[in-house]
């Protein structure tokens, strides 16, 4: 399989670069700038992309790489900081710009393989404070902007290309074409990264790895674990046992839908552990959000591992780890920046033959594509992000069975209306929150004092920042009318119009 290396120098768009490359049917993987040169040589990459980054090449502490990489004979594309780094390593001159360039800029290019089928003038996205004053020997200037005399350069003999802007973002209107030119015209890629091929190859790999042993998977009903279950089921059938812990904090009917899907559509052993009463008892009287999260997490893993301990011939332990989890769990100088929820540490007293992560090469959109190919219902494949503690962090204050029922009903109405109006895939996330607030209302001739429901809906590319969704008023009105008429004990609906930051997407 053809592979492109995305060499990470700390850029915020490193995953986006890899995704854009994969969108063009070429496999890309991200490695930190600390990866040894010998490892890069051994992988026979078709090309290398240097990412951007927030640093300056003048700073001795900034990310650098050995100049020998420029002599490998492997095509290289430098983006933003990566562009300046190539210049710096090859002996050119980089200076601090008298004025920074940020945002959409008009770019003019000269003939270059990188700019085939790109208009001479186009809009690109700039974000830099340093600039190239003098390109290295052997490099030609191939692009400029009003304030940046060297916005692109190349050394055709060495197949090294560099751009000061970000072709991977949608604001660069012909960025996709530029990346395609690098992959197919410069690197000579054929485009063999196809989801159908991945499924076929992964099933064969799993069968070889597992052999006649069993596999246990913790199934949450989320996208990642559901697709992992589907793939493992296709590979080994009844050798797979899925454990689904139902803590009673799922959305309405969700536990039943998960059980129905995996018992009817797939060949596997399915264990559903209903333990809502246990969770309600543990959460009684608790109002602090962090304490609620801690209790739910602790109880969940105790139930899960107690169930696992009861299984004979455990074999392998499978997880729904996806590619961003791998990047986030071990980034930069091999430092762990966070332990991701999709990577679970197993207790010392539970022994497995090994850990399986069948989706660890895939981004979320690729996971969804695999799920659809496997025949998993779209309602599960396109399920929105759902916190591990479930509705427990969408009920402000103490969690009770009555509050769960109220929130489930309201949330079901919201999801139904969003689906009817085509917003299921349009919005990054939407849900209801039950604040610890009661309000006065009038229903019929009677005064009421019932719950308030808050609706939260956001648009975002990466969840690092988010904007509130501009849902039309007539749709919001219909949602409000249905919730107050169809759901018991609710007399008021409000809409959260706060961005992230200053707010987070979830309320707790």
Where are these predicted regions, by residue range?
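RNA-binding accessory domains that recognize and position tRNA/RNA substrates
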Residues: 1-50, 54-72, 88-315, 330-508
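Gly/Ala-rich beta-loop-alpha elbow adjacent to hydrolase catalytic centers
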Residues: 78, 82, 87
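Active-site regions of oxyanion-processing enzymes, predominantly non-cytosolic
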Residues: 318
